[in-house]
Amino acid sequence: MDLRTGEYITAHQATSGVYTFGITNPLYFTITRHNQNPFNNKYNTLTFQIRFNHNLRKELGIHKCFLNFHIWTTLQSPTGHFLRVFKYQVCKYLNNLGVISLNNVVRAVDYVLFHVFERTIDVTENHEIKFNFY
């Protein structure tokens, strides 16, 4: 849903994309929170954010695009190592597709978390997306 207008994102907006070779460093990854063994459970929770680069947003007609993911996992790896491997695998998936779009980024995250990484329990996603009016 567009955060500004409240309208749903159309299929055309979600699937329109840009070739990966046309833009350098299209995505910015950051870990916003990491809880190790909350309430003495056997899992960790990670919250990370994927932001679209200015050039990618300009090509797609997006004013703002933040994809926030909250992950429950039993992996015990350090957060820096997790982020580095996650970023590499997502970029590798997108390079193999050749096109970056909203749907492809969400598919890449789903593929990496559930097929590349083992022991992912659950993932929730929320987003802040604003499309350009003009």
Curated annotation (Swiss-Prot):
InterPro entries: Gemini_AL3. Signal peptide: none annotated. Keywords: Host-virus interaction. Pfam families: Gemini_AL3 (PF01407). One of its GO terms (biological process) is viral process. The keyword Cell inner membrane does not apply. It comes from the Viruses. Increases viral DNA accumulation. Enhances infectivity and symptom expression. Homooligomer. Interacts with the replication-associated protein (REP). Interacts with host proliferating cell nuclear antigen (PCNA). Interacts with host retinoblastoma-related protein 1 (RBR1), and may thereby deregulate the host cell cycle. Oligomerization and interaction with PCNA are necessary for optimal replication enhancement. Belongs to the geminiviridae replication enhancer protein family. This is Replication enhancer protein. It comes from Tomato yellow leaf curl Sardinia virus (TYLCSV).
